Amino acid sequence: MLDPNWTAIGGLFAVLGVPGDRLVRFAEQVPAMSRRPYGLLLTNLARDNVTILEGPKLAEAGLDWTSASYGDPLHGLAGHVVRMRYPQDQVNEVVQAWACEMRRIRPPAVSGLDRDLPYYLDFERIHAAYDDVIRAARSLGDSIENLALLAAASDIGTALKRAAGLLGMSEVPPEKEIADALFRWQAARLVRAAERVPDSLFRWRCDDRVPERDDFPSDLVRRALAVEGVAPADRVFRGTAHLNTVVQLENYPDPVVVRRETAAAPRREQGLLPEHAVLQVIERSGVQVRAPRILALGYDDRRRHVAIHTYEGPGGRSPQHPVDGLLPAEADELVDELAALAEVDHSSLPSNEPEGGFYRWLAERLADFVAALPDATLRAADQRGLPDGDLLRQILGRYKVSDRAPVLLHGDLNPWNLVRAGRQGGLTIIDWEMGMIGDPLYDLVRHLHLTPTRTEMRVRMFDRWSKKLPAECVVGWEEDWRVYRYIEQIRSAYVDLDRMTTGAALSTPNVRRAVDAYEMTLSAATGSLGLRRRVVPKVPASLKVS
């Protein structure tokens, strides 16, 4: 079902956050099933494919045999149950009626029914979700009318919500975002068929904060938007806060990235500086920091804010991230780039010196973040011995750090924001939306906290960093780096617990890894706080949801 459609629609699945290989991965996890005699099946026995004739006793007729197949009778039953969308209280009644009749005419067909049917039901629910998305997208025909887009988006949203857990989706995009994705996909298909970009589509309104560039004028912007919707799935990267689509333009030498904010999982921790402003300052400075260039910023046909950046991955391949830690040469490159950031003139950026210094501001910000967490997350934190915002503020207030000259910071140097062997060669830093002005020590310590780093590598990086940066940027670092490590351990305990409680962004790789290591994170945080960790009773295996 998917293979014939994947070239045309695979990118749309990726934009929606739907993995394309979920059916295959699910099938690989299914244990060996009981043997049952194969027979003729109707794999699409749904309401639209059956006609009930009235008479002395009801009889079905007019069956649609176009989906006929041959195989395990449980497969046919599962397909019928899923496609009929019976209320949950009727499912068992239907299954028992089927089993009763099968025991009468073909007893071996019910062998292993209770054990094997749930696997077939889940498989069919995944299958139906893919099928429903394809059907809804195809139902548009050549239309880009808003009512048609919203209707298709509603159908897709319903299908994805019904199977989100089975698809491995931690959240489903809201219908407005789905409709926008459908518009881009549909309009891009129409443009490709017409072999030109009509004036009525992909109109562009420039954001004055990033004036039109001579090396990337508005006609290139429109062409980038016109091919975004039909980009293949392996060129679409959906992160915790942004959707990035890599496109190649005709007669333009390098790929570019169309970058949009996602609405599904709003980031609780917001950056202080606009990403475009940070990238502009870095580009103007001319320092040796490998970072994207901002090519355009503005609004598309649907009044959605869009940025276009240079693509910093290796040519023709997906970006590679140092998820298992930096190599020695890469560690040196990162330190050198942090030293170069210290040379950037950030006076044009909107930032004020925080009262009480950077660390006090950071601690206050974390305490405010904790106080604003949802009630469910706060209850979960209390159960695990984590303090509320007021007590956390008092605990963090005990620490002091030396004053160091403020510099431009990336703010979130996790491995997925670093690209190996990028366009400019060497290690490239991407995703600058958490940029800020502050203590240069913080960027390095946060990176070491978020990235697997051996002790000898940490010593190497600190030694190089302390020698590369100006003296006013490194004073007192030997005593202070642990304070920043404490605050990052504590932050992770709250951030990861919130994701576990709310389910936000759990499908992204960096979040999955953080959540999987939560027991270690919690132990480190309670140790940093000097508090006793409470024992949270574990749910018995018999009560866990499979």
Give the positions of each predicted feature.
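Conserved kinase catalytic-core helix
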Residues: 1, 12, 19-33, 280-289, ...
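Active-site catalytic-loop/activation-segment of kinase and kinase-like phosphoryl-transfer enzymes
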Residues: 1-30, 167, 184-199, 353-399, ...
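Conserved short submotifs of the Hanks-type protein kinase catalytic core
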Residues: 302-316
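ATP-binding glycine-rich loop module of kinase domains
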Residues: 240-273, 280, 319-323
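Short beta-strand micro-motifs within the conserved protein kinase catalytic domain, predominantly
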Residues: 293-304
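Active-site acidic catalytic loop and adjacent metal/ATP-binding pocket
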Residues: 27-75, 237-248, 257-258, 395-442
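Active-site activation/catalytic loop segments of kinase-like enzymes and analogous catalytic loops
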Residues: 74-108, 125-144, 441-474, 488-506
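ATP/Mg2+ or Mg2+-diphosphate-binding catalytic cores
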Residues: 131-211, 495-546
